[in-house]
């Protein structure tokens, strides 16, 4: 199945957890308005506005009183005009930014966690070369959204970010100026650019971790094997 994995765009290689380095990386928080059906806004803050076309949901902590009334409701993304739900997940940080975040596929590992746990759609827009895909996503149906996406097709994430931020300023969907921040970001140990999370075809083996019947069957098959030394059978 298609699944996310860490990717270094410079070395053009997948990166294992053992090869990761977490480093401080400068960026900017952009306060962006999504809109309800009555056009009232709800604001999120993001360091990666170029991923707006890949947004699949807004996520807040289930105990956050500010957003409890909105769980299950739909909002529309700015510029690209795609409807997404507001959902609850315990990994959301109430004291970070606006306390509600957009989940995009994929900006970071938290996006991957939300995508898996909440069974969200896959809307990947970054290629292995680190550039925006050249094909128009089928979930963008609004003419204005299509026109803007055509402007970022094939661009680097840095160039796409500038185009999207300029468009947000022009549309009035960005509240104030971007605020500088520093965050911990994953790098390949040999690389000098932050890792991207791209999707690729991957194969999985069922090991019985979530299936008790399969687990019992595999244990019985394991008893048919000879282990040397025998105590390694239960390791």
Model-derived features: positions:
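Active-site cavity-forming subdomains of large catalytic enzyme subunits
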Residues: 130, 164, 188
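NTP-handling and nucleic-acid-processing catalytic cores
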Residues: 1-129, 134-135, 139, 221-235
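Phosphate/diphosphate-binding loops
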Residues: 155-182
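A glycine-biased structural micro-motif
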Residues: 69-72, 139-161
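Glycine-rich loop/linker segments at domain edges
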Residues: 183-227
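A glycine-rich phosphate-binding loop feature that marks nucleotide/adenosyl-phosphate handling sites
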Residues: 4-14, 180-191
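Anion (oxyanion) recognition and catalysis
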Residues: 116, 169, 189
């Amino acid at each position: 199945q298609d699944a996310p994995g860490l990717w270094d765009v410079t070395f053009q290689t997948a990166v294992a957890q053992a090869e990761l380095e977490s480093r401080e990386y400068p960026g900017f928080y952009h306060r962006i308005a999504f809109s309800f059906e009555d056009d009232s806004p709800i604001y999120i803050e993001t360091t990666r506005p170029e991923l707006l076309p890949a947004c699949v949901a807004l996520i807040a902590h289930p105990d956050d009183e500010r957003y409890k009334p909105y769980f299950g409701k739909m909002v529309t993304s700015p510029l690209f005009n795609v409807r997404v739900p507001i959902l609850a997940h315990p990994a959301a940080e109430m004291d970070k930014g606006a306390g509600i975040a957009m989940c995009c596929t994929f900006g970071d590992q938290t996006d991957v966690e939300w995508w898996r746990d909440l069974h969200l759609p896959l809307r990947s827009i970054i290629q292995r070369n680190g550039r925006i895909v050249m094909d128009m996503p089928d979930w963008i149906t609004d003419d204005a959204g299509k026109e803007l996406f055509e402007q970022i097709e094939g661009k680097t994430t840095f160039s796409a970010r500038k185009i999207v931020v300029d468009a947000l300023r022009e549309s009035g969907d960005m509240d104030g100026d971007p605020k500088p921040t520093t965050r911990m970001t994953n790098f390949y140990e040999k690389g000098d650019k932050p890792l991207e999370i791209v999707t690729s075809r991957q194969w999985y083996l069922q090991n019985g971790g979530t299936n008790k019947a399969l687990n019992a069957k595999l244990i019985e098959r394991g008893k048919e094997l000879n282990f040397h030394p025998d105590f390694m059978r239960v390791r």
